[in-house]
Regions:
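C-terminal catalytic lobe of FAD-dependent flavoproteins
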Residues: 212, 228-232, 296-345, 351-497, ...
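Helix-loop-beta segment of a Rossmann-like dinucleotide-binding subdomain
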Residues: 160-166, 183, 189-192, 202-241, ...
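Core beta-strand elements of the Rossmann-like FAD/NAD(P) dinucleotide-binding domain
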Residues: 55-57, 268-277
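Extreme N-terminal leader/targeting segments of oxidoreductases
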Residues: 1-17, 22-59, 74-77, 615
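A conserved short coil-to-beta-strand element within the FAD-binding core of flavoproteins
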Residues: 248-260
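Dinucleotide-binding Rossmann-like beta1-alpha1 core, especially the glycine-rich loop
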Residues: 100-203, 335
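Glycine-rich FAD pyrophosphate-binding loop
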Residues: 76-96
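Flavin (primarily FAD) binding-site architecture
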Residues: 280-295
């Protein structure tokens, strides 16, 4: 498989983008989707004009998280005139704060959710095939102290009693994995589980606590860039259906009879339209959204907060290698840690919250996660200073009376609001990241039935974004990248970096001859950032830094980089000097409050390049002082 000329659009480069006369600079792959390429470079103003011209549509999806986006795509694939609105940025709520696992849910077997596990494993296997650029295998290790812990608790659950939280022994885990392997057999993509005895466990993992005598190894999967996958689903949906339209920073303000009033959160403009059906996909905010729609706040959601840490710990990274360690702490809470962007992703907590607004990983939660890791790796020193980044999100779980949060179902359901109003409202309750496609398909089928329309196209085997035409196997991948490097005059190293970020979608970009690297972040180039700004529906600096790039998550973000990115974004997004500085200030406040990234930390990460080589901050003054203090 080799790249061939296609239909790319380099208009985003403008007069300063360099560009290339080589047709290979705008290429697609043989074997890709039959859909036309996404509409590249559609500005927010143009999108709003298209929305104003609509008047009446078939379906309005409220909420731009992964489940709302999935429903939007499923409806677009059927040719439905569907609009999706998100009051913040796409993928900015719980969808941006998962454990980065694409998994069947081994723990859910304890709750008897066999159907959910079976569905999750099938969807995991499909994502490995349909989104191989972002979803990859994750060998997972379960450390075990003994053979029989948890046996009585499992028996109590089987007999209808309430189990006592606690550790699981080798026997229970072995039985669970046997069932897990059995359910994963359909469209199998990964190896079956294995067990290690005392000697092998201590030889292979000497950093484990001395009380750990056994280990189980099985395979699940992980996702590297969940936010990007969501954006690709939107682009694919809009390519499949010219009427489909998704807009961020546009929220539902109220429903007046059959007229939905939308508010642009950036300008305050009000836009109205009429929909035959509304899909409430606002996740943890479903009940609040229903209050806007009908004046009655429902009680469908009982969310729990999950917090995670990104740790800079070379010793822990060496101890676990490429495997995830999946373990129960003293309280019986399942915890995880695995390598991610060269660091350690660790989590998580499970705390009930009354409101999803403004959640963050508190100091007590960070301490809890660190202490849980020490239970398994007592010889590896960890402290607050090792935390590079922290994040939290609220799982939109169905309201339940469970005494233990882990017992609340992670399954999903579609529920029509009752009593019905002038416009029928379908609520998407629950759901986990892995099953977004199945949940979206279920929601779309429910809506199609209400509209009296049949499904015409399945997404089960439909490649996503940069997973289209993806080269199979390491040898084919190397050859593919070599061909791209030769045809575009780009170094193989640069091609490999772009491939890791975008998969085959990198061919929509491909750098021009004067693709200058960022002074403060040479892993990115100025043209690459311009392309992201032009094609990624970026409206704020936070959109760019937190959800179109991974530099905050990976510990690469510095104050210099924030200023350099803001300067690049100002012109295409139409920001004045004052607006640009306000964007910087808002981002710094958000990073400090929600992610534990203080301005002093960002200053300490600044480039060691001489000051004259760094871009001047907007508004003048010192790059190292603006926005701090």
């Amino acid at each position: 498989m080799t790249p061939k000329p296609g239909h790319g659009d380099a208009s985003w480069r403008g007069s300063s983008g360099g560009g290339s006369s080589d047709p290979a600079a705008n290429t697609t792959l043989a074997g890709g989707s039959e859909d036309p390429p996404p509409r590249v470079g559609t500005s927010r103003a143009e999108r709003l004009d298209r929305l104003r011209a609509k008047g009446r549509i078939a379906v309005l999806v409220v909420g731009g998280g992964i489940n709302g986006i999935s429903t939007f795509r499923e409806l677009a694939l059927q040719g439905i005139d569907v609009v999706l609105v998100e009051r913040g940025d796409f993928m900015s709520g719980a969808s941006a704060a998962p454990s980065r696992m694409i998994h069947g849910g081994l723990r859910y077997l304890e709750n008897g959710e066999f159907g959910l596990v079976k569905e999750s494993l099938l969807e995991r296997n499909r994502l490995l095939r349909n989104a191989p650029h972002y979803v990859s295998a994750l060998p997972t290790l379960i450390p075990l102290a003994d053979r029989f812990s948890g046996t009585l608790s499992a028996a109590r659950r089987f007999l209808g009693g309430r189990p006592k939280p606690g550790p699981r022994g080798a026997l229970i885990v072995r039985l669970g994995l046997a069932l897990y392997d059995f359910y994963a057999r359909r469209e199998r993509q990964l190896p079956q589980s294995r067990f290690f005895g005392r000697r092998a466990t201590r030889f292979n993992w000497p950093d484990f606590h001395p009380d750990i005598n056994y280990a189980a190894l099985y395979h699940d999967a992980k996702i590297s860039r969940p936010e990007q996958l969501g954006l690709e689903l939107i682009a694919d949906a809009e390519s499949a259906c010219p009427q489909a339209l998704a807009l961020n920073h546009l929220g539902l303000a109220r429903l007046d009879g059959t007229i939905a009033e939308l508010t642009d959160s950036l300008t305050g403009e009000r836009i109205t339209l009429t929909a035959e059906v509304i899909v409430n996909a606002s996740g943890a905010w479903i009940d609040q959204t229903n209050a806007l729609i009908s004046g009655r706040q429902t009680v469908l959601i009982g969310g729990t907060k999950g917090s995670h840490l990104v740790l800079d710990s070379p010793a822990l990274l060496e101890a676990i290698g490429e495997r995830m360690v999946y373990f129960a702490n003293r309280e019986g809470r399942v915890c995880i840690l695995f390598a991610h962007f060269g660091h350690i992703l660790a989590g998580s907590t499970d705390i009930r919250v009354d409101t999803p607004d403004g959640v963050r990983c508190e100091a007590s939660e960070a301490a809890y996660i660190l202490e849980s890791i020490r239970e398994v790796f007592p010889g590896i020193a960890l402290s607050e200073v090792d935390i590079l980044f922290r994040f939290a999100g609220v799982r939109p779980l169905p309201r339940a009376d469970a005494n233990v949060n882990a017992e609340i179902s992670r399954d999903h359901s579609c529920e029509w609001s009752t009593p019905p109003g002038p416009v029928p409202v379908l609520n998407l309750v629950g759901g986990k990241w892995t099953t977004f496609r199945a949940f979206g398909a279920q929601a779309a089928d429910t809506v199609l039935a209400r509209l009296g329309t049949d499904r015409t196209r399945s997404s089960e085997a439909l490649a996503i974004g940069g997973g289209k035409g993806f080269p199979q196997g390491e040898a084919e991948r190397r050859d593919w990248l070599r061909q791209v490097a030769i045809s575009t005059g780009t170094s193989e190293e640069r091609c490999a970096a772009l491939f890791e970020r975008y998969g085959t979608r990198m061919l929509d970009f491909m750098p021009g001859a004067d693709d200058a690297l960022l002074a403060s972040l040479p892993s990115y180039s100025r043209d690459e950032v311009r392309w992201i700004l032009a094609t990624g529906q970026v409206a704020t600096l936070a959109d760019l830094v937190l959800r179109r790039m991974t530099i905050a998550f990976s510990g690469e973000l510095s104050l210099d980089t924030i200023h350099e990115l803001a300067a690049l974004a100002a012109s295409p997004l139409g920001w004045s000097q004052a607006q640009t500085q306000a964007e910087i200030d808002r981002l710094l406040t958000h990073l400090d409050h929600h992610h534990g990234l203080a301005a002093t930390t960002l200053v300490a990460r600044n480039s060691s390049l001489p000051a004259p080589l760094l871009p001047s901050p907007v508004g003048g003054g010192s790059t190292r002082s603006v926005g701090v203090g």
